[in-house]
Regions:
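N-terminal secretory signal peptides that target proteins for export/translocation
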Residues: 1-6, 103
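A generic local structural motif
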Residues: 88-92, 119-120, 210-211
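N-terminal targeting signals for export/organelle localization
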Residues: 2-3, 12-15, 21, 25-83
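A short beta-strand-turn-helix
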Residues: 83-101, 125-126
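Intrinsically disordered, low-complexity proline-rich regions
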Residues: 10, 16, 81, 106, ...
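C-terminal cap of thioredoxin/glutaredoxin-like
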Residues: 31-45, 182-250
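Solvent-exposed, acidic/flexible segments
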Residues: 33, 37, 41, 48, ...
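Structural alpha/beta surface segment adjacent to cysteine/selenocysteine redox centers
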Residues: 104, 109, 115-189, 194, ...
Length: 250
């Protein structure tokens, strides 16, 4: 059946209703080469008056199809970008670098939801000695976020990424002076850190993360990738442990 594009809002509902086995009068229209918008809308109205519960069924069916299609596309994208996810030399690695499962985290230092999972990430690193964690700086919340991401990647050059990362995650102040002070407290050279923050490779690494996030359909932080699963949002430790166990099992 071809339907006038002007009827698109009603058309997808009609197609869902038809898929659920809606009444015969609709089938009588299917032989026509094209249905105008007014006719489609009238068919939908008639169906709604006769069997309103079909609307919910059609919507649920559409949502299931959309969710399945989104999951399929994400898995394909994860497979296509596997090297960028787990093997990018510009992305710092925590936990066991030789671990048997890799957990990738996309985050922003100003993101309240990212801060919620800090304790879970620290606990996972301590408890699971075979877990490898890849940190993907994804500063999306303004200038302070970008500055903190640059500083963290610069700290990697001094071999202090992980402690500096977690310190930034719990710091309320991400100003230049606060970052310098934090670096000094953790035994980094603040002057060297500041110099390295402006290295072009640092911005290139962040830009690569932006592109990768877009490829994967990541729309916010935090987001996690384990195996072929992408999990958005501040998931709890138990959920992460289950995903890691699934990846390890199979």
């Amino acid at each position: 059946m071809r339907i006038d594009p002007k009827a698109s809002a009603s058309a997808w509902l009609l197609s869902g209703l038809l898929a659920l086995g809606a009444a015969a009068p609709v089938g009588a229209q299917a032989a026509e080469p094209e249905l105008p918008a007014e006719q489609v809308e009238q068919i939908v109205r008639d169906l709604l008056l006769r069997e309103p519960e079909l609307v919910l069924q059609a919507l649920e069916q559409l949502q299931r199809r959309q969710a399945a299609e989104q999951a399929r596309r994400q898995q394909e994208s994860i497979a296509a970008n596997q090297a960028a996810l787990v093997s990018d030399p510009a992305s710092p690695v925590g936990g066991n670098p030789e671990g048997d499962v890799t957990l990738v985290e996309f985050f922003d230092y100003r993101c309240a939801y990212c801060r919620r999972v800090v304790s879970s990430m620290q606990a996972l690193m301590q408890e699971d000695r075979q877990l490898r964690i890849v940190f993907k700086e994804l500063p999306v919340l303004g200038e302070d976020s970008v500055r903190a991401a640059r500083a963290a990647l610069a700290a990697e050059r001094q071999g202090r990424y992980t402690p500096f990362h977690f310190a930034l995650m719990t710091s309320e102040d991400l100003s230049p002076d606060a970052i310098r002070q934090l670096a000094a407290e953790l035994g980094l050279d603040p002057d060297q850190l500041e110099q390295d923050m402006n290295a072009p490779e640092i911005q290139e690494a962040i830009d690569a993360n932006y592109r990768l996030a877009q490829e994967l359909g990541i729309e916010g932080t935090p987001a996690f990738v384990v195996g072929d699963e992408l999990i958005p949002g501040a998931v709890d430790k138990g959920r992460l442990e289950a995903l890691i166990a699934d990846a390890r099992a199979g």
